[in-house]
Amino acid sequence: MEAKRICPYCMGELESRVSVCPHCGGVLAGRYTVGEMQSIDGEGILYRGVENVGRFRVTIKEYMPLTLSAERGTDALLRPKLGSEVLFKTTRMDFADLYRSIQRITPANGLEAVLDVFEENNTVYAVMENPGGIPLQQWLDERPSPVSAETARNMLQPVFDGVAAMHQVGLVHRGICPEN
């Protein structure tokens, strides 16, 4: 019996005859190439990506709730765990609604613009601009001295403005942390 092969980036099952994951490096919506996985949380997976028409970098957020999702098959379809089908579908719709709401208010100062939201592979993807940069925690760790209050305020003001824009339309971020 041959051991099951798993993609080290998205943890999807690989067929024995393929050498490249059909999901990572694959093209979504006919326009976005999925790159390396950057992070994973309870809501889903964040990938680097490329928009293939204008050839610019993007960030792709995939709805994949770990507590509700079964293993992704070789067909790249995301399946809910047995008994979690209704909650999976409901939260998938919530994910799509959230990113479509953010798309309507961006580009608000301090928020990455949501460029596209679409369904494919029995999941939802949100494509966002990728302005580059490094996470705040990494920037702080690499500094030789503490940050002044004025520098911190100036640097974080766009974040405050973005959160305020979200609150004005009834959205709550729930994911702000120095690692982002």
Where are the regions a protein language model picked out?
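ATP-binding glycine-rich loop module of kinase domains
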Residues: 52-100
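Conserved short submotifs of the Hanks-type protein kinase catalytic core
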Residues: 121-135, 139
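Activation segment signature within eukaryotic-like protein kinase domains
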Residues: 155-156
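ATP phosphate-binding glycine-rich loop
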Residues: 44-50
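Structural motif at the C-terminus of the N-lobe alphaC helix and the adjacent alphaC-beta4 loop
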Residues: 98-109
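Activation-segment/catalytic-loop signature of the eukaryotic protein kinase fold
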Residues: 116-117
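Catalytic-loop of the protein kinase fold
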Residues: 163, 167-180
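Protein kinase glycine-rich loop
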Residues: 35-41
